[in-house]
Amino acid sequence: MDAFLETSLTASKYVLIILSVCIIVRCIRSMLSERYESEVWAYIRLGREILPVNHWENIIGRSRGADIRVDQPGVGRVHAVLKRSDRGIWTIYDVFSRGGVWVNGTKVGSRGINLETGDVINLAGTCVRFQDITTEKREKLESARTSAGKRVSPFMTLFELTVFQLFLLLQHAISAHANHLPNIVLGFVLLIILEWTCYNAMRLMSRSGFEAETLAFYLTTLGMSVAASSTPADMFKQILLTIAAVLLFLLCGAWLRNLKRTAMMRDPVAVLALLLLAVNVLASDAVFGARNWLELGGYSFQPSELVKAAYIYVGASTLDRLYRKRNLFGFIAFSAVCVIALALIGDFGTALIFFVSFLVISFMRSGSIATVFLAVTGAGLAGFLAISVKPYIAQRFASWGHVWEDVYGAGFQQTRAMSAAASGGLFGKGAGSGWLKDIFAANTDMVFAVICEEQGLIIAICMVLAVLTLAFFAVRSARHGRSAYYSIAACAAMSMLMVQMGLNVFGSLDILPFTGVTFPFVSRGGSSLLSCWMLLAFIKGADTRRDASFVVRPVRKIEEYHVGYDAETDDYDYGDDGTEEDEP
């Protein structure tokens, strides 16, 4: 019997590796290798040249990076913003241009001017004509685009993931104690039901792009395996948190579908995030030098994890708000308060993640390398000050690169992590068969090493590739997002997950200082899991492939323009007095 179990365990290792590679390769093929076909919403006619309008928010200017490039004398690098509302109403705004913007002879003021088909737009002497497209034309263009999942079936990829989960469950059935086996089986069965329920819900919505969710479920499965190895008695709690995380992902995605509603709630979300951090600063107790945990009804959670999603929600911006100084200064102030609060509670790993996201958002807002350089310089000085006043942080930096010199002190965790990772080899020891899981914080801060030990280096690399695939997909999708809000949010969300992964992997291997941050979707912890699934909703918001994302509204009939309609026109002030002037 023992020989049969040993043979089954060995065979399952190879099957898991093959399935992992297949899942990652199929997702890469579907998300990154297929040609991205942009949406077309209108046209701008410049003489005989016809320029497609591919987004709901477009920069018009002379810059090479402009969405609608008009390379003519007098036209500024960033001259105007052309925006489409959720109701199909197009509005043009003047963005600090020197030559001004006129529509049919009327100067564009601070509130912008609504456009209709055939309107002539004067950009500092260069005239272009706006041409909206009919519903029939739009539907024809949309039907010509390739549907997501047509070349690589999401059903087969999810089926492979299900087989992967069953073989992983087999390994736990071999290694787990009999008392814990029912909890482990229940956890994996409910996870399989959850992912197929989510898939079928998307199919009912005529959505065929399920690659990002599949990668998230793949990572969550590995996290479930770590929980089954380290804390099998808490498996039911872990699956409940997973269900809550997926539901929160669906709710966030549904909320993001309405861009105007999303933008209107940025200030309330910012206030809520600051209140959470304030409670964290005032009410939490220090644990190993940090005060980042709150106790509520017998359960502990990290407010900073939930604030991650709020930070991106507040930091992203639509194009018409992007150039407002008040909006930019407000975001900088919000970022400063968040980082200071994280410093006060001693969560410098999360503070670093926030800072990198701040750099990404700042660069996408301004496009200025100088701004990023100044921010990095200021952060370097702040980091030096933190090391000076926080002894436990200084100790971590002192042991960085020297953990083998103090294997029973400052280097205790990293030396064990590296030893366990090396002992797993390429194929691992099998789920639940390692010893690192018994070390403090192994299932959170050193989870990469736990996967290396139990599942082998190949699956650990697949785990990293899953996050990298999401990252490249987010950047690729951002170029085609309907709104700058979705593009900025997707890139910022992915920067958080990337930095989080890098700090976890390289920190546990002593390549970077050990900061104690979690691996996205994999590390045990409800707060982290909730946060990661919420961030995934931002990535889905930028995915404009045909029938791909439930966050993106399908192409539908545009309602008729309303004479004097004002509710959809945003009352933004760009510095001029809004008075009419004669056309040049």
What are these model-predicted stretches?
Residues 17, 189-194, 242-245, 453-474:
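Hydrophobic alpha-helical transmembrane segments
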Residues 504-584:
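A juxtamembrane structural motif centered on a specific transmembrane helix
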Residues 475-516, 522:
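Loop-to-helix entry and N-terminal half of a specific, functionally important transmembrane alpha helix
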